[in-house]
From Swiss-Prot:
Coiled coil: none annotated. GO terms for biological process: removal of superoxide radicals. The gene is MB. Pfam families: Globin (PF00042). It comes from the Eukaryota. Residues 2-148 form the Globin domain. Belongs to the globin family. This is Myoglobin. The keyword tRNA-binding does not apply.
Length: 154
């Protein structure tokens, strides 16, 4: 299920545009995640008070966490599938501390694709979207495998 060199190039090219505004993209991703999948908000103690889009928009903590999420994902994507060193500590905290189900990783993957498509429609066509979906699926599958190693069925 690996990606070709061309697919990785497509992923990393669009990711460069994401990195140009990590705060904006990260904030948009988390806002959309919590709006589309409100059950995910329960996993974030410090964000539970954010009930409305306006509250989410004004939250500096949410913005900061969005940067953290996309920074970590970017480090993993840049490894082009050879991401064991980056993935293991992330999987460990998500499995043992935060207890984030794999289903929620699917949700955020879908949201990431939507947000990138909205912000960069001219640069994120069908081929790039397919490559990104594949890269995020690889990430999720590897996270799920690591979860099992840590005794979390997710």
């Amino acid at each position: 299920m690996g990606l070709s060199d061309q697919e990785w190039q497509q992923v990393l090219t669009i990711w460069g545009k994401v990195e140009a505004d990590l705060a904006g993209h990260g904030h948009a991703v988390l806002m959309r995640l919590f709006q589309d999948h409100p059950e995910t908000l329960d996993r974030f103690e410090k964000f539970k008070g954010l009930k409305t889009p306006d509250q989410m928009k004004g939250s500096e903590d949410l913005k900061k966490h969005g940067v953290t999420v996309l920074t970590q994902l970017g480090k993993i994507l840049k490894q082009k599938g050879n991401h064991e060193a980056e993935l293991k500590p992330l999987a460990q905290t998500h499995a043992t501390k935060h207890k984030i189900p794999v289903k929620y990783l699917e949700f955020i993957s879908e949201v990431i694709i939507k947000v990138i498509a909205e912000k960069h429609s001219a640069d994120f066509g069908a081929d790039s979207q397919a490559a990104m979906k594949k890269a995020l699926e690889l990430f999720r599958n590897d996270m799920a495998s690591k979860y099992k190693e840590f005794g979390f069925q997710g």
